Swiss-Prot record:
Name of protein: Probable tRNA pseudouridine synthase D
Entry GO MF terms: pseudouridine synthase activity; RNA binding; tRNA pseudouridine(13) synthase activity
Family: Belongs to the pseudouridine synthase TruD family.
Entry annotation: catalytic residues: 83
HAMAP family given in the database record: TruD
Catalytic activity, reaction form: uridine(13) in tRNA = pseudouridine(13) in tRNA
Biological role: Could be responsible for synthesis of pseudouridine from uracil-13 in transfer RNAs.
EC number from the UniProt entry: 5.4.99.27
Disulfide bonds: none
Keyword set includes Aminoacyl-tRNA synthetase: no
Residues annotated as domain TRUD: 158-379
Length: 416
């Protein structure tokens, strides 16, 4: 199953026909510019560089920079990972004493420019990202269709805030399934899927296929290529211990969390799709809903309150003024649950999946997931678009952190 087939289960909010087309035919078709939080420029212990990369994964670029500069890659901070098949601009921090060495680094398709001194940049230290995207091979009436779709979605309050396919895997769409298996305590099933899932189009898929069919760990260690280092780590650990749980827990914590977060994201997407399907409004709070506060167009997901009969009109006015947004569940042991109709829908999904919120507490301690809330709608800021001859539709907009340009484009393109 590829991501298009996987995403076909999630309802579009727009009912109008899309423009079709393709993205990321060239890296320059997808430009991402990070907007950092201002506080990263406070302090003197770290040198802040603007990193421009083309066709590089963020982590791979960071490791290569560290290697060339002679520092540990863990000493380099960044606010978030950016698309690989794109041209991206983001800020990184390095120890101040390493500034000159980093300035001397020369890597193909990577540019580094010293900006100022500041503090260590942690994941999440950004406001959001600005995008410039070209969609090629679109329909002849793409501009008019885009205009109609954007108008329709503005009337409905915004774009559905689905987690993008990047959360689940573009070709091996299994991250969320692995997450569910981990929550069920099936570490062997999770490990076998992590090691063996394949679609036949990626390097190393023949080795994955052989393991999927035979379960032969010794053979897998011989056949798995070196770049599949996490898979090889897991295999070596299983060979040493004979225990799949201990083998899986040998993986770095951020890798294990990817799977739990992917499953959370799947359940959120499912909730959002069901709400659209059942005709429950996304931009009008219902009694029992949990809303998140919004300031300057940025949602603050840690500031929530419940909608009651008493405050319903007050909250509706807040939503109309874009000072609050209706939220959906990121299931976890400490998540604030909705009540009323929204709460029933949350309960229905948990029951279908055989889960309770406490299930997320029973994970090994570092992986236990408290959960939270996420706004149901996405409102691109400064959205502009136009048709460029011999290229296609060009889109420009800003999105808050944690949201996906591909989810905006999905409503316009209707390609999956």
């Amino acid at each position: 199953m590829d991501y298009r087939e996987f995403f076909s289960q999630f309802k579009h909010l727009s009912e109008k026909p899309g423009i079709g087309g393709k993205i990321k035919i060239y890296p320059e078709d997808f430009i991402v510019i990070e907007e950092p939080i201002p506080s990263i420029f406070e302090g003197r212990k770290y040198a802040i560089f603007l990193l421009k990369k083309r066709n590089w994964e963020t982590m791979a670029a960071v490791k290569e920079i560290a290697k060339r500069a002679g520092i540990n890659y863990r000493e380099i901070g960044f606010a978030g990972t950016k698309d690989r098949h794109a041209v991206t601009y983001q800020y990184i921090s390095v120890p101040a004493e390493a500034r000159e060495r980093v300035e001397q680094v020369s890597i193909r398709d990577i540019e580094l420019r010293f900006v100022s001194y500041g503090r260590f940049i942690k994941l999440g230290h950004l406001l959001g990202n600005r995008f410039r995207i070209i969609v090629r091979d679109v329909s002849e009436d793409a501009f008019d269709r885009t205009k109609e779709i954007v108008r329709e979605l503005r009337e409905k309050g915004g774009f559905p805030n689905y987690f993008g396919y990047q959360r689940f895997g573009e070709r091996r769409v299994v991250n969320h399934i692995i997450g569910k298996l981990l929550l069920q305590g099936d570490f062997e099933g999770a490990a076998r899927l992590f090691l063996g899932a394949h679609d036949g189009s990626m390097e190393g898929d023949e080795a994955r296929k052989n393991f999927w069919e035979t379960g032969d760990v010794e053979r897998a260690l011989e056949e798995f290529p070196g770049f599949l280092r996490y898979e090889r780590t897991l295999l070596h650990r299983y060979k040493d211990t004979g225990n799949w749980k201990r083998a899986f827990l040998s993986l770095p914590l951020p890798i294990m969390r990817i799977f739990i977060h992917a499953y959370q994201s799947y359940l959120f997407n499912l909730y959002l799709s069901r709400r659209i399907e059942e005709g429950l409004p996304l931009n009008e709070p219902l009694v029992g809903d949990i809303v998140v506060q919004v300031k300057g167009g940025i949602p603050y997901r840690d500031r929530t309150y419940r909608v009651t009969e008493t405050n319903l009109e007050f909250v509706r006015e807040k939503v109309r003024k874009n000072q609050a947004m209706v939220s959906g569940p990121l299931f976890g042991f400490a998540m604030r649950r909705a009540k009323g109709l929204p709460g029933e829908l949350e309960k229905e999904i948990l029951e279908e999946e055989g889960l309770s919120l406490e299930t997320f507490r029973r994970l090994p301690k570092p992986m236990a997931e408290p959960g939270g809330r996420r706004e149901l709608l996405l409102r691109p800021m400064g959205m502009a678009y136009g048709y460029i001859q011999e290229e296609g539709m060009c889109f420009r907009f800003f999105l808050p952190k944690g949201t996906y340009a591909t989810s905006v484009l999905r409503e316009i393109m209707k390609d999956h």
